[in-house]
């Protein structure tokens, strides 16, 4: 995606920093130095400073605050800040106890942060520099003297170093603890596409990934990974490949940290910025499950979110931190997990993190009610005939799904067709099962239950209410007549429509499913003629193309979009199927 609301990189970076200060009044932005700092810092504690190119937010700036980073210096997007900027940041939060500078293992970062560090040392001040290197995708042979790249493990080093400094530990101890964390880190990423940097030309088409292609190990600045994969593997297969690179001790090129099943491990899942939280959350769970199943690793802490992004990158990363060993410093032992658990006041760090992931729900789960199975009809129907009629209807609906989806994408959110298809597939599965009965009331009520289980959103609720009302109408009618006929079904449909109207303001003329449903029901009640009722439903659906929508997301569509309502088309597909 090469479209942005703000295309000036300098405006982006500086205003992004100012936003953090807007939210946290203990933070101040140094505009000339382009860094943000915690102005209430304790001058007797070690100051912890980090930074790097912009575009990786919340790293580094959102982790500035009490108990974490003292300052973070920002370069332009994907470019290291200058040594002058960094040195100004160091002087801004100078401490009696000294300064620990943390950067990621990239040449530009090391040179600029290192130059600033040497200036501070020349001035007679205590200062140390550590570079986070946690990427496993580029092995020892390829990385050579440069070493591993720095990825999302950097955030855990920020947290641990900041917590150690907040305890008042000396610079040597804080540095030793932070280095111990780096030595136990492994990370890897996977991406579906390169990212576009605001203000830059789009990536050349010949360099862009194809639709059925992804890159394993792609860096956070669009750098190449270890390989491109086509076709894109299943998520389970992809996770297996990623964990193998992280944990396979037989791969001497990448076996940086030995992690075994009985180790204490922290898992950090990183969203590169462009994955929906729904998809990212599902991926995170799959990683946790794969660790347990394939490696017997059960993390003691799990973090998931956008920690070190690549602008709006379509990808994710996995970071594992081995925390089994206590770090020994001057006769004292320190737990990395305890330091991670230590409270902070930094905007980017998760506030809600339970200290014991092994805690389980002890009260048990309530069961989902199956419905009233004690209601019975005084009559039965030809089971196979009804079954086939329903099958015809649902298959016709499934066949119509692409058309429904097309029109709903033009005038809505595009999910009407797929939602109806899910419901149809659920009904088909039910009617072909042993649970399908010859009791007409139970058939209708069970279909209502199936709809509840398989169709979400507004349309699912509307159809479920309609069919529950249908079952009630059938029950009331059969209690009086004890005879099953087209009039019985018509009476049930009339009650179903009345029931639906209790819960929706939609009426004919509003460009909704009601424009097809109401004429169908009214015609069938009046004539008991199915074909005539279906024809009226078609006319009602066709008419919606010229209506102004008054309900649903279609309300926001421009008047020039003339398409029939997708919900009305769905009704037509259902009732039309009964005539086949």
Curated annotation (Swiss-Prot):
Substrate binds at residues 53-56, 104, 109. GO terms for cellular component: cytoplasm; cytosol. Keywords: ATP-binding, Glycerol metabolism, Kinase, Nucleotide-binding, Transferase. Transmembrane segments: none annotated. ATP binds at residues 413-416, 458-459, 512-513, 565-567. SMART domains: Dak2. GO terms for molecular function: ATP binding; glycerone kinase activity; triokinase activity. Residues 384-580 form the DhaL domain. One of its GO terms (biological process) is glycerol catabolic process. Its EC number is 2.7.1.28, 2.7.1.29. The active site is at residue 221. Pfam families: Dak1, Dak2. InterPro entries: DhaK_ATP (IPR012734), DhaK_dom (IPR004006), DhaL_dom (IPR004007), DhaL_dom_sf (IPR036117), Dihydroxyacetone_Kinase (IPR050861). Residues 8-349 form the DhaK domain. Pathway: Polyol metabolism; glycerol fermentation; glycerone phosphate from glycerol (oxidative route): step 2/2. It catalyses: dihydroxyacetone + ATP = dihydroxyacetone phosphate + ADP + H(+); D-glyceraldehyde + ATP = D-glyceraldehyde 3-phosphate + ADP + H(+). Homodimer. NCBIfam families: dak_ATP. Catalyzes both the phosphorylation of dihydroxyacetone and of glyceraldehyde. Belongs to the dihydroxyacetone kinase (DAK) family. This is Dihydroxyacetone kinase 1.
